[in-house]
Amino acid sequence: PYFADIIKAVSRGGAKVIALDFLQLIPLNKKIDGEDHDGIMAEALMEAENVIMINLLRWDNTLQGLRAVNPLPRYRYALEPNTIGFANLSIDNDGYVRRQTLLLNDAQNNNYAYIGLQVISKYFNSVIKKEKNELTVNDCIIPVNRYSEMMINFAGPSGTFPIVSFYKIWQLAQQGNTEFFENNFKNKMVLIGPGNIYSQDFKPTPYYRS
């Protein structure tokens, strides 16, 4: 129930959008006796109404196209419409991340937006529009190429955005420290994701120094 506790606390603190960079594929209620942990999580998603979850788009030889690997159906049904974004990174041949694909279609021609783009769309309560070589969300105009890729305008090196440990946030949620959540998360975009340097999410960028 850790994710559920944090989502509820951050949402009640006034966060405008919460991005959950974690893909749960195995039902927890089949793994853990006792409480219905999937149900607890689904209730938190329904209560918050502002959570973006990730999926992954994987090549499928049978389909000869991309296949969406989505969160558990129970989670998807609890989400608001259009609140899943793909987490596939665009990685250059040297292993660095300098650009990002923002839109992808699967083999059934379903259109998906990158999680970061979905977060912006949710934050501004605006639809994503594409015209020629531009994507528009609210008043944000994003230049893209024909593959819907943008060059990333990095805000700065690691540490540019505040990071708080998952465990600390959970402890504060358990304590009911509403003041902390309002002071730190009100009207903010909040990303919940792995912080371990060995995570697959950690990739070198032009700011990287060995």
Question: For the regions a protein language model found, what residue spans apply to each?
Answer:
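Non-transmembrane functional regions of envelope-associated proteins
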Residues: 1-145, 182-210
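Substrate-access "cap/lid" subdomains that shape
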Residues: 131-176
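Short, mixed-charge amphipathic alpha-helical segments
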Residues: 175-183
